[in-house]
Amino acid sequence: MKSILLLFLVLFSTSYYASAQSRAVTGKVTDTKGETLPGVSIKLKGTSIGATSGTDGRYTINVSGNNSILVVTYIGFVSQEVAVNNQTSLDIALTIDMQGLEEVVVVGFGTQKKVNLTGSVASVSSEQLEKRAVTKSSLALQGQMSGIQVRQGGGNPASNGASLVIRGQGTFSGAGTSPLVLVDGIEASLDLVDPNDIQSVSILKDAASAAIFGSKAANGVILVTTKKGIIGKPVFTYNSYIGKTEATMVPEMINSWEYAEVINQVFADAGAAKRYSDADIAKFKSGEDPVNFPNFDHIGNLFDSGNGISTRHDIGVRGGSEQTQYMFSLGYYNENGIITKNDANRYNIRVNLDTRLNNKLKFSLKMAGNLNKNSQPSGINGAGLGTIVGGAMRNANSIPGRMPDGFYGRNETLHPEADLESASFLQNNGTNFYTNGSVIWDIFKDLTITGQIGHTYGIEQSKAYVAKYAITPTYGNALNSLRENWSEGSALTLQTIAEYNKKIKDHTFYLLGGVSGQTFGGKGIGAFRDAFPNNSIYEINAGSTARGTQTGSSSRNTLQSYFGRFNYSFRNKYLFEANARYDGSSRFPQDSRWGLFPSLSAAWRISQESFFMDLKKGMPWLSDLKIRASWGQLGNQSVGNYPYQDLLSLAPVYPFGSALSAGAAITTLANKDITWETTTVKNVGFDLGLFNDKLSFSTDYFIKTTDDILYSVSVSNVLGATPGLTNAGSVENRGWDFNLNYRNVVGGFSYGVSAILSLIDNKVTKLSKVNQDIARGLFVGYPIGSAFGYKSNGLFGSNADVTGYPTQPFADQAQGGGIKYLDLSGPSGAPDGVVNATYDRVIIGKPLPTSTYALTLNGGFKNFDFNFMLQGEGGRNDQVNLGQFFFPLENNSNVQRDAYENRWTAANPNPNAAYPKLRNIASGFFNSNRVDFWYRDASFLRLKNAQIGYTLPKKIISRSGMSSLRLYVSGENLFTLSDFYKGWDPEMQTGGTAWYYPLSKLYVAGVSLKF
């Protein structure tokens, strides 16, 4: 008690002494022109004492002693530290922060001031990327910029990167929709760059900014700049985190006794005897006999079989002298999936070196390498996790897992536990090396020539091993096998660039010209063997050659390019830019090999006009205004090599006399006149800054049209060969990009809010000489990939409701609880009382989103910082494209709880039920025909990221030699709002070989230190 009293007296006396020595300091904060600045933060250095200037710019703050220092900060102005001395009145004038005006962004073959851009370019800095604890660099771009759709396709650690689409899907050909990615000017994969090595990412969205990349820029361009060395003593950094993943959404299946009751009900509806007795159902519920009457959750067992632990470590050093600067980094990443034996490992190294050889010559060298090792368990077909996930979706809880006798289930050919516990696996290993060297020659003040050479080399190896194992005493995989593939690819880039920059009074000119040559090559081999001695030997030469096969391939293509840029600026307010690239690709016939891709753009910085200065006197909150317009053309040559050549097959044999002789047959008739896909982009936009650019807003409207899409048209089978590609299609994307940013400081609290929104309308405008290609989801006037099917009007309430209704297309479904198909038209153009495929199918599904959006809130108070991001998509409706693995009881499949609880039943014959009547179909399907009944709104809003960090005070860490130590916790994909099917993630495109490996919800604890 005495100790507490003594401590109280000490604290009281200390505070009394401090208060006795304090005094008030008042003053006014203005800019250099004398204009008052409200909301300025004034803090007493080394304390938490602070004040904020009022609307008249005035402030009052209490200080103690004559050695006090005020720290004055205001967004858009240079921060100041002002000594108080013995003053009680202290006016402060802040200077505009020119760094904001001088902010540069990376563009094609150089940089430009952001305020002088005439095209549509979005950028994100390393500081923004570091706020995301992501596994792949592509995922860090989600929600950062408008105009780019970033969608993660699944949670498999071996393939959990994101697909990137800039301003809509521009083609439906094999040329693809992926943007061109350049890392330090050389083509590379974005996900093979460690996120910690990235300095900035720029997205070139319109033709004005991307035309200088010509025939590879139709889908947009992503420019990645890696970190460089710095002048000064070495700065060491270490970043690390440990994380735990779990599934975002998993469909819940019904219990075994509920499944038994459903089966009994559907049997009764069909007039058949029950499959399960009441005693059987009681045993399912009690769990007394888990072998014969189990309640085994196959999905839960599968997605909980892995530990889901991920770790990441990055170390780096940056430093250098005035002459030479260097950067070196090492990184390691490991992720264990939520499924056992499923993991990914990445090792990476990077060295960046910049040196000045003399006052005219500079040399830059960038080298990087990475090693990726991915593995996953495999099903009986050797295709990886697809069969295993499918089996878990399909098998009811009434089917046991591994039984005491070592076997699985009851005569089930798809048994995930058997596959998971077998020695089967799928492994993929990749090694990549990048070298990028350049020499910069400053010939004289305004003229620079750069020579650059870049080389990339990669090796990929895959092994798919299927073990010998038994599922039941009478069924299993009796023959083990191994399929192994090996491939290598390389690319060599040589380019020379000349730049001339000249300012004559109010006129600024910039000229760039260059020549580039690229060579791409690859080769691969593959082999298959089976009948290995046991499940422990899986080297290809240990298998039998009796059924063995071998494959081999090689390819090569080249691209020759000439490009240029012209910039003109008058008084930094009238801006003009022209770009052009002339490409020649070996992928096209000689007569159509070359293509010219030009662009023109202009901008008017209205804020630099004298009348704008006068306008600001009445509206001082108006700080910047610019309007922009551009037009240009881009190309797409990312098709297979030499598609203008006929393809031959050497397999056929022909009779000559009494013997068969080997021969050749044409299998593909090529079009000798094919050429580039050409994309024309028109863009108008404006940029607005308010309140000294604390609030900024920009918007763009664009029309992006792709013509001459390479497309294989349908022909009669009488031809006897597959037709080659022809330039026969067109697609249009129209849309808006919106960006809003606000930043402010209130007292000691700094915060920022950013919002992005992209609206887009995609449609096919031409399809050879037809209006639709149903099999490919192509319809003139509708988005790429549109679903074509029947319309419906709920369900039949009873069998009696079928009477008098138009004849249904599927007779066995025309009953109570069946989907009620609509009669829309007939031969005369009016409903004819019969629903059929010819007249009554229309567009029912839109797989492409019409909007993408994100809202980010970040800030800091004292040593704490935070970042929250909401992200989502809208305007898309879709179904779950997994057939029997989604539709209840079809082909003996499982039943989801959502369907169980919301289905039509005889006891509750709701014609508006979410699911139709359940029927047991041992082979085939009942209600899974393509109809709008199954299409749901796939829009969603997701808490994509949340991160909270704390930076330890320097006085605590200074003795350790560290200059900074930050601790943080972070989460990804934390929760989702959606009206899509329960348990199914709307961000994913399920179906095909991707199956359903749910996205990962990631919880992370990390540390970042610098010394």
For the regions a language model picked out, list residue spans one by one:
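Extracellular/periplasmic, surface-exposed regions of secreted and cell-surface proteins
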Residues: 129, 177-178, 346, 352-361, ...
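Glycine-rich, aromatic-lined ligand/substrate-binding cores of catalytic
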Residues: 847-880
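Short, small/polar-rich motifs associated with maturation and membrane association
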Residues: 1-350, 355-358, 362-370, 432-435, ...
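Acidic, glycine-rich flexible loop segments
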Residues: 274-297, 310-314, 382-418
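Extracytoplasmic gating/loop element in the C-terminal half of outer-membrane beta-barrel translocons
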Residues: 290, 299, 474, 585, ...
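Short Gly/aromatic-enriched secondary-structure transition segments
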Residues: 252-254, 466-468, 527-530, 770, ...
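Conserved small-residue
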Residues: 237-291, 726, 745-847, 887-890, ...
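Switch/connector loops and helix/strand junctions flanking conserved nucleotide-binding motifs
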Residues: 114-115, 212-214, 232-233, 247-249, ...
